[in-house]
Amino acid sequence: MRRRKAPVREVLGDPVYGNKVVTKFINKMMFDGKKSVAEKIIYKAFNKIEEKSGEKGIEVFEKALERVRPLVEVRSRRVGGATYQVPVEVRASRQQSLSIRWILEATRKRNERMMVDRLANELMDAASDKGAAFKKKEDVHKMAEANKAFAHYRW
């Protein structure tokens, strides 16, 4: 383990909206350091959302992240030879990173042809409590609910 906690680096806002969460999403989406490609995909997806739903793309994006954000998750805890799935609350920073990760995973698994369409549709689905990313959150919450009996093993 490291001696000191690593400092949390400050992220700059994205060039269009000045939003730090959008920057994190762009960075998480980027492959092989191709940031400009990731930015184009996200901004085109926001435009597509505005065309389809009439709502602002950034608002749908924020609503989707909020809806996919998990409140509890399960962590494995070994007690006397048995491994228990212990439900624990999720820190705010982890909630954000998990919601970003789940939306991107769900987006990449969709079968529309263009990444722009996939992202736009997944964000709209997540904002309206549908889609694979929202289902992932529901599954995590169900696991935590099912293992509520082991909550006293918290650490």
Swiss-Prot record:
Cysteine pairings via disulfide bonds: none
InterPro entries documented for this protein: Ribosomal_uS7, Ribosomal_uS7_bac/org-type, Ribosomal_uS7_CS, Ribosomal_uS7_dom, Ribosomal_uS7_dom_sf
Coiled-coil zones: none
Positions of transmembrane segments: none
Gene that encodes it: rpsG
A UniProt-annotated Pfam family: Ribosomal_S7
Cited Gene3D superfamilies: Ribosomal protein S7 domain
Protein name: Small ribosomal subunit protein uS7
Domain of life from the UniProt record: Bacteria
Keywords: Ribonucleoprotein, Ribosomal protein, RNA-binding, rRNA-binding, tRNA-binding
Single GO biological process annotation from the record: ribosomal small subunit assembly
Recorded GO MF terms: mRNA binding; rRNA binding; structural constituent of ribosome; tRNA binding
Homology family: Belongs to the universal ribosomal protein uS7 family.
Ribonucleoprotein as UniProt keyword: yes
Subunit text: Part of the 30S ribosomal subunit. Contacts proteins S9 and S11.
Entry function: One of the primary rRNA binding proteins, it binds directly to 16S rRNA where it nucleates assembly of the head domain of the 30S subunit. Is located at the subunit interface close to the decoding center, probably blocks exit of the E-site tRNA.
NCBIfam families assigned: rpsG_bact (TIGR01029)
